[in-house]
Amino acid sequence: MDVLDAIKTRNSVREYLSKPVEDEKLNVILEAGRLAPSASNRQEWRFVVVRNPQTRRRLADAANSQTFVGQAPVVIAACAETDGHVMRCGQLCYPIDVAIALDHMTLAATELRLGTCWIGAFNEQKEPINPKPTSALITPSIILSWVFY
């Protein structure tokens, strides 16, 4: 599958198989995020791989009670160092940088025949990941799972 095929094929998936995602595939997906461009190559993101069912349920609660979040075997919680770095246009860098990295990850997952779903509705005040990376803010995240194709 080439990148254009992955773009055409990728869609939001909210029903998952309970089959675990192999570490090798997860590492490929995380590497795709790591290789994403960022403002001044700051790489302000931190990715937390969540497999623990209780933590996934807390993430689901923090994601406006979207229960499907807790049903996936893996959630990649995207966190960002929020030091206030701003582009010349006045926009904070981290939301754009994290979004680019997550998009790279969703396309890599699609190539591996895994389903993903962006989770943008999120209440950071609930702090479902403990401990989370120091001074990091939890940002939109993705769910990762085998899906029914």
State where each predicted segment sits.
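Small-aliphatic-rich amphipathic alpha-helix that forms the alpha element of a beta-alpha
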Residues: 33, 76, 88-130
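A glycine-rich helix N-cap at a beta->alpha junction
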Residues: 67-72, 133-149
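Short secondary-structure transition/capping segments
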Residues: 54, 128-133
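Glycine/small-residue-rich phosphate/adenosyl-binding loop
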Residues: 25, 31, 35-101
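Specificity-determining recognition surfaces
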Residues: 1-25, 147-149
